[in-house]
Structures are given as structure tokens and as C-alpha cells.
């Protein structure tokens, strides 16, 4: 397995609105292509940030799933709704350590 930690920093004061919008509109779409491990709201460091961790079998699976997601008309319609909330976006890929409960 490979994990993608995707962090979205949103406009100040818009985090709650962003999360509601993402949960109701974005999550049902992207969940067809990726497995959500968890979603967290940062309470320290870079504030107004939400962290999602997504699981994929490997990089090839992630590439394939993201390509399918990008072809989904519902996702294409969702992106313009999401973009005004964003200040910064970052993706980090992680492999579990041998002793990690998440494999």
C-alpha cells in the first residue's frame, strides 16, 4: 500500500464551510476512486488546514485511479467550486514502516 497525505490550506474563516462542501459534494465522487483513511483539521502549525489521507495499492494504482477521476464529469464540475476556498495544496506520498499497523 501507498498513502497520499493531501493537505489543503483554506481561506481564513472558511474551514467549516469548505469541509461541509467537500463532504457533501467532493467526497462522494472521489470515494469511487480512492479509499479515505481519515480526515483531520490542523490545530497547530499552518492553521486553516485540512489533511486527508488516501490509500492506494501502489503508485500505478494511484495514477490509474487519478486518471479516471480526472475524466469524471462530476469531479470536473466540482473543482471550480473547490478552488475559491484554497490558499495552498500539498501532496506527500508515504510508505508504511514494517511495524506500522497500517500496511
Task: Describe the function of each predicted region.
Residues 11, 32-51, 57, 74-103:
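Glycine-rich beta-strand-turn "strand-cap" elements at beta-sheet edges
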Residues 1-17, 98-103:
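Surface-exposed interaction/gating patches
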Residues 21-24, 68, 81-84:
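Residues within well-ordered alpha-helical secondary structure of globular protein domains
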Residues 16-20, 58-70:
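Short amphipathic alpha-helices within nucleic acid-binding modules
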Residues 14-38:
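Short amphipathic alpha-helical segments
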Residues 2-6, 18, 30, 49-54:
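Short, structured motif recognition centered on aromatic/hydrophobic residues
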Amino acid at each position: 500500500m501507498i498513502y497520499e497525505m493531501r493537505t489543503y490550506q483554506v481561506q481564513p474563516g472558511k474551514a467549516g464551510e469548505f469541509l461541509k462542501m467537500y463532504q457533501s459534494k467532493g467526497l462522494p465522487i472521489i470515494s469511487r476512486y480512492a479509499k479515505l483513511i481519515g480526515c483531520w483539521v490542523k490545530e497547530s502549525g499552518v492553521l486553516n488546514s485540512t489533511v486527508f489521507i488516501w490509500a492506494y495499492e501502489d503508485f500505478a494504482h494511484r495514477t490509474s485511479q487519478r486518471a479516471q477521476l480526472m475524466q469524471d464529469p462530476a469531479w470536473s464540475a466540482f473543482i471550480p467550486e473547490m478552488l475559491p476556498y484554497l490558499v495552498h495544496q500539498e501532496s506527500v506520498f508515504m510508505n508504511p514502516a514494517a511495524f506500522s499497523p497500517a500496511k
